Amino acid sequence: MRLFGYARVSTSQQSLDIQVRALKDAGVKANRIFTDKASGSSSDRKGLDLLRMKVEEGDVILVKKLDRLGRDTADMIQLIKEFDAQGVSIRFIDDGISTDGEMGKMVVTILSAVAQAERQRILERTNEGRQEAMAKGVVFGRKRKIDRDAVLNMWQQGLGASHISKTMNIARSTVYKVINESN
């Protein structure tokens, strides 16, 4: 059994020092501590990727706190399952939680349920926000293409910018912009 450590900060203002010190105090050698800073996406987690390549069956990964392993609950659960499939257990120092043994399996099951509830809650909030925005007239999707020829034809026919903007459902300033660009 080899001990590895993983530390992650989600913003550039946070420091890895406290996490790294805790990992060393727990017995992890400095060359087996992997870190990631201010990672917004999973593709940016070089420390985690290196850790994935180094660990083998029977190894243990120490992490200072539960929330330091993944960016969100779903990400954390996916990582726990991935390491569990390799025969690698994870221990969270501050939380006193370990993924090995029957108790560990139960913890993972509970966390999976929490992750599912979190995904559902996010989906509900997203839909509520979208409906609220639509009620306020926010238009989703790509900006539609303006038919510049139609705007210019109407202008040449002597129609005013206000009439053109209402007919074409575009801003009056857009009408003037199209006219000025054509000159």
From Swiss-Prot:
The keyword DNA-binding applies. GO terms for molecular function: DNA binding; DNA strand exchange activity. It holds the Pfam family Resolvase. GO terms for biological process: DNA integration. Residues 161-180 bind DNA. SUPFAM superfamilies: Homeodomain-like (SSF46689), Resolvase-like (SSF53041). Residues 2-137 form the Resolvase/invertase-type recombinase catalytic domain. The keyword DNA-binding applies. This is Transposon gamma-delta resolvase. It comes from Escherichia coli (strain K12). The lineage of its organism: Bacteria, Pseudomonadati, Pseudomonadota, Gammaproteobacteria, Enterobacterales.
